[in-house]
């Protein structure tokens, strides 16, 4: 992470750049040209300018002020990382937090500016020179990079800014000029995902996508999101930390499929595979020319996952059809091979987790207390021993005591603490196996607990079980079920601000849509074959955190005269710590569910454990 001094210098240099471009503010989102949650280092401009390294957030710099918006998962971490920098934390989602446009407007007190260059584009020098050192009454300008902002985001931001008398200007990425030693775009080799794990040929997937395009009246589409490209073509990569994807675009029409990526990434084996499947390849930068020359009458773009510049490159004769991603709902429903892969991956992951928990128990018993980083390294090492392990699926969250209240905490040498034989350890982790992706959270009692720790742990467990036990009509959306995870804690006046669950990719991104469990409305229906996490939590700043998470598979429950009903089947196989539970708070059916779950965990994992590990696991049920 950058030193605070470096952040201050970068903001100073950016302000000089802004004055040269005639800008009064500049906005840095978290995304890249592929509009994903996780991005290669090359496009981590928000982190570069602010020092905040969370996966979600927006940094805004004006000529005199700076602020960063992020959600509740990162409130505590962001406050710490922004301390000593020009950036003020804006807690997104809270009633008192202003919108970005409101805040910018409040920071710009009048519209009289000395223009040194009223153009964002470096080649418009004539207009800039004519305005040099001249004073005008103008509309204050807010700059963004059109390559890293979605179509929907640009429109919404433009409307919001205009309402408060500000003008949105799309132009260059200032980091191109200011970021010293900026990492390049990754050129790691692409790999083929075998059919035994993919479960469907890329030819079949392409045919399904073409059929969906025809139904929407579109002749073609640009696929931007990296996990969608990887899924569609049955390819994987290592360009994004913890996510097996590669930097590319796909332009698909009814007659052709073209993959735009760095030629260095294409091995001999992959080149033969692409040729066999009639997939053309062009350099990554070739998409610009291809869109400018696009001859189709219509092109479908997803406004929430396509960057603004894609549509602006198209000829005026091309009609853009806007529609939510056609691939996301296809990818979300796992086929038989993918489900089999998930089940097998969860067994291996469960074995690694049990071995880790046994190790932790012995370490605490011996007095050789590990640190949070030790916990991370040990668990990763045990996972790496498992067949088909490729990587972790996200940076491990090992938060002891107060660190457990930092929802997306990551231990560093500066923050690392040694565990003690008391309190709670919140451990959220996962792995990328070639046949499946895992995501699991366990909160572990290391010794005596306070009544608050026990009660919070029990409320979280009750919420997890209530949602996990749900039976619901096919087509129900996650918003309608989210309350089940929160109901028990709401009775105590407790809540958490993050979502309750997200989809999980098949050896792809650990966060996947379009379905979720969350309070705000998400229209995507829950359907058989979808994977989704259930992860309620309680976080007390400066004290402790508790979260319990399993990855679930949505399966058919029963058909009646009232319709089809679905249920959630746990895929994750790992014991849930029972020592913190206040049993008087648990209902009989909740206890029965927990007992049945632990019985299944033992039956499925014990064949792969040694006698000592079996004995310990047997005590957990």
Question: Which ranges hold each PLM region?
Answer:
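Active-site neighborhoods and metal-handling regions in enzymes and metal-associated proteins
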Residues: 1-621
């Amino acid at each position: 992470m950058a030193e605070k001094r470096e952040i201050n210098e970068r903001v100073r240099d950016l302000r000089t750049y802004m004055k040269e471009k005639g800008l009064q503010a500049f906005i840095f989102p978290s995304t890249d040209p592929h509009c994903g949650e996780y991005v290669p280092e090359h496009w981590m401009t928000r982190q570069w300018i602010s020092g905040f390294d969370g996966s979600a957030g927006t940094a805004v710099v004006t000529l005199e002020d700076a602020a960063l918006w992020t959600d509740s998962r990162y409130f505590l971490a962001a406050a710490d990382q922004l301390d000593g920098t020009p950036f003020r934390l804006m807690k997104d989602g809270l009633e008192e937090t202003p919108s970005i446009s409101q805040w910018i407007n409040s920071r710009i007190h009048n519209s009289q500016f000395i223009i040194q260059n009223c153009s964002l584009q470096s080649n418009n020098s004539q207009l800039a020179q004519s305005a040099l050192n001249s004073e005008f009454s103008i509309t204050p300008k807010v700059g963004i990079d059109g390559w890293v902002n979605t179509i929907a985001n640009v429109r919404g931001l433009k409307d919001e800014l205009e309402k408060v008398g500000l003008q949105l200007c799309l132009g260059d990425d200032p980091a191109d000029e200011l970021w010293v030693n900026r990492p390049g775009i990754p050129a790691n080799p692409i790999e083929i995902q075998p059919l035994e794990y993919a479960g469907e040929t890329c030819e079949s997937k392409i045919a399904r996508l073409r059929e969906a395009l025809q139904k929407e009246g579109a002749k073609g589409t640009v696929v931007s999101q990296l996990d969608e490209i990887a899924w569609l073509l049955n390819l994987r990569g290592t360009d994004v930390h913890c996510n097996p994807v590669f930097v590319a675009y796909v332009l698909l029409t009814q007659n052709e499929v073209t993959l735009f990526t760095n030629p260095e990434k294409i091995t001999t084996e992959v080149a033969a595979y692409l040729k066999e499947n009639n997939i053309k390849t062009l350099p990554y930068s070739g998409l610009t020319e291809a869109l400018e020359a696009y001859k189709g009458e219509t092109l479908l773009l997803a406004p929430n996952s396509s960057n603004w510049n894609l549509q602006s490159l198209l000829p005026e004769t091309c009609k853009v059809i806007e529609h939510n991603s056609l691939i996301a709902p296809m990818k979300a429903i796992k086929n038989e091979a993918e489900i089999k892969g998930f089940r097998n991956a969860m067994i291996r992951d469960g074995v690694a987790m049990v071995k880790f928990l046994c190790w932790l128990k012995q370490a605490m018993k011996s007095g050789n207390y590990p640190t949070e980083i030790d916990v991370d390294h040990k668990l990763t090492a045990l996972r790496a021993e498992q067949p088909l392990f490729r990587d972790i699926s996200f940076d491990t969250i090992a938060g002891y005591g107060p660190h457990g209240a930092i929802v997306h905490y990551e231990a560093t040498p500066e923050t690392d603490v040694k565990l003690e034989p008391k309190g709670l350890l919140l451990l959220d982790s996962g792995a990328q196996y070639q046949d499946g992706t895992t995501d699991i959270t366990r909160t572990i009692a290391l010794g005596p607990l306070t009544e608050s720790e026990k009660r919070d742990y029990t409320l979280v467990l009750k919420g997890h079980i209530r949602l996990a036990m749900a039976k619901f009509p096919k087509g129900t959306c996650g918003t309608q079920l989210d309350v089940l995870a929160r109901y028990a804690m709401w009775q105590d006046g407790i809540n958490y601000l993050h979502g309750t669950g997200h989809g999980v990719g098949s050896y792809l991104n650990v966060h996947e849509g379009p379905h979720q469990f969350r309070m705000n409305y998400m229209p995507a229906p829950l359907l058989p074959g979808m994977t989704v996490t259930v992860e309620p939590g309680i976080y007390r700043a400066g004290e402790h955190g508790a979260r319990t998470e399993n990855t679930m598979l949505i399966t058919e429950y029963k058909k009646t005269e009232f319709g089809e009903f679905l249920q959630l089947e746990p895929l994750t196989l790992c014991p849930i710590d029972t020592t913190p539970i206040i049993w008087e708070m648990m209902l009989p059916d909740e206890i029965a569910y927990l007992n049945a779950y632990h019985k299944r965990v033992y039956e499925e994992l014990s064949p792969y454990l040694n006698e000592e590990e079996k004995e310990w696991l047997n005590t957990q049920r």
